[in-house]
């Protein structure tokens, strides 16, 4: 342990460790790093994946220090993970960090273990989703839970995006309740709130071959099987079987390793004319402005940012009732909650909106009202800073005894 290093006038050194900057976890991490006081903190970003050009430009413009460490593979691999662990230990020792703040599963396990071995005084883990039961392998899930229990003994705090996610971890006996803090994700919502005012709807529709008769359904997220796109495709297929002449367009916004599989599956269901893969888009709010409803079929989420963004645009949402979803979607108030994997129920809820445009407007308005003022980036940064401050004070007090 690096005793008393915190009790000085120099800047507090923090390392944020994450697989890559993409999706909600990465966005939260960047907002936090950007918002923290640079006169008080010296912050480094440690990650494995290569950066997209827009993210790289953003990091350079904000003068964020970052280290890219390989091999940072998503899947568990003993040799690669051992090498990564050793590299992190060396990095933390050389950097003399006061706080290591990890995010996501593998960086959370290896990063905290490395921080412990390197003698980092304060170790924090960010919970962006319930990652304990997501693998198809029961053995891997059991190992993750076992490791999380062990590592919890030297984890000083858990910062969760959702009360429900915290509760899941506590139910498995991971850490003590006093170590858990819930901080809502911070988001830039103005561009979503004003999306329908600031774009030429007709021009955007032309880009994707959407006409005025089409009922437009949207989905935003990584194109990976855990996002459950195939359930949504199956629901669209059923609707077209029930209503053969129903004009439907499904906008799938995002990129991911399973894009080819999903594209192939859409073709197998004869949905080529209905499903539009837009690829990665920086202007998500413009595409959301074209949608009648938003559908999220993820099988795991922490607190889905896209549902908040859709609500800010004024779009009602249908979502599988998992983890933090119910903290945003109130059933039959600003959207509908559906039993996970239940295609029949999903189909029925989509049809319910198709048959009732007034309900779309009502739920859309309720959604906008619900999210207003609750997802402040400034609030997220201030609460994170307070946790850092309290842990530092606590550590100094213990070292002085």
Give the location of each predicted region.
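A conserved mid-protein helix/loop that constitutes part of the nucleotide-sugar donor-binding site
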Residues: 23-31, 215, 219-241, 257-264, ...
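A short helix/loop element that forms part of the nucleotide-sugar donor recognition site in Leloir-type
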Residues: 54-57, 193-210, 216
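A short, well-ordered alpha-helix in the C-terminal region of glycosyltransferases
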Residues: 115, 203, 345, 352, ...
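A short, active-site helix/loop in glycosyltransferases that binds the activated sugar's phosphate group
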Residues: 154-182, 187-191
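Aromatic "clamp/platform" in nucleotide-sugar-dependent glycosyltransferases that forms part
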Residues: 280, 299
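Short hydrophobic beta-strand element within catalytic cores of glycosyltransferases
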Residues: 316-319, 329
């Amino acid at each position: 342990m690096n005793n008393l290093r915190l009790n000085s006038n120099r800047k507090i050194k923090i390392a944020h460790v994450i697989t890559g900057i993409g999706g909600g976890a990465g966005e939260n991490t960047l907002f936090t790093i950007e918002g923290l006081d640079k006169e008080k903190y010296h912050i480094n970003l440690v990650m494995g994946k290569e950066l997209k050009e827009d993210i790289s430009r953003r990091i350079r413009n904000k003068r964020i220090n970052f280290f890219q460490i390989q091999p940072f593979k998503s899947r568990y691999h003993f040799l690669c993970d051992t090498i990564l662990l050793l590299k992190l230990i060396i990095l933390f020792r050389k950097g003399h960090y006061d706080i290591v703040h990890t995010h996501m599963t593998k960086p959370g396990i290896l990063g905290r273990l490395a921080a412990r071995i390197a003698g980092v005084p304060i170790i924090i883990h960010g919970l962006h989703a319930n990652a304990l039961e997501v693998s198809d392998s029961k053995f891997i899930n059991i190992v993750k839970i076992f490791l999380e229990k062990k590592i919890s003994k030297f984890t000083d705090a858990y910062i969760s995006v959702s009360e429900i996610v915290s509760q899941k971890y506590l139910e498995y006996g991971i850490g003590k309740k006093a170590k858990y803090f819930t901080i809502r994700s911070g988001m830039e919502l103005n561009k979503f709130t004003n999306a329908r005012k600031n774009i030429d709807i007709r021009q955007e529709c032309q880009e994707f071959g959407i006409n005025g008769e089409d009922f437009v359904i949207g989905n935003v997220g990584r194109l990976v099987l855990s996002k459950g796109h195939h359930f949504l495709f199956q629901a669209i297929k059923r609707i077209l079987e029930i209503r053969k002449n129903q004009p439907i367009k499904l906008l799938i916004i995002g990129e991911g390793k399973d894009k080819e599989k999903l594209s192939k599956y859409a073709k197998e269901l004869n949905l080529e004319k209905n499903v539009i893969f837009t690829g990665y888009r920086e202007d998500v709010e413009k595409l959301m402005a074209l949608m009648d409803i938003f559908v999220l079929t993820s099988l795991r989420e922490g607190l889905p940012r896209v549902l908040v963004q859709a609500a800010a645009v004024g779009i009602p949402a249908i979502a599988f009732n998992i983890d933090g979803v119910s903290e945003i979607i109130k059933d039959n108030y600003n959207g509908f909650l559906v039993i996970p994997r239940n295609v029949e129920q999903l189909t029925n809820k989509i049809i319910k909106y198709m048959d009732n445009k007034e309900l779309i407007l009502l739920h859309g308005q309720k959604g906008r009202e619900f999210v207003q003022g609750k997802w402040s980036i400034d609030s997220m940064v201030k609460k994170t800073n307070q946790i850092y401050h309290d842990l530092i004070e606590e550590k100094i007090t213990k070292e002085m005894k």
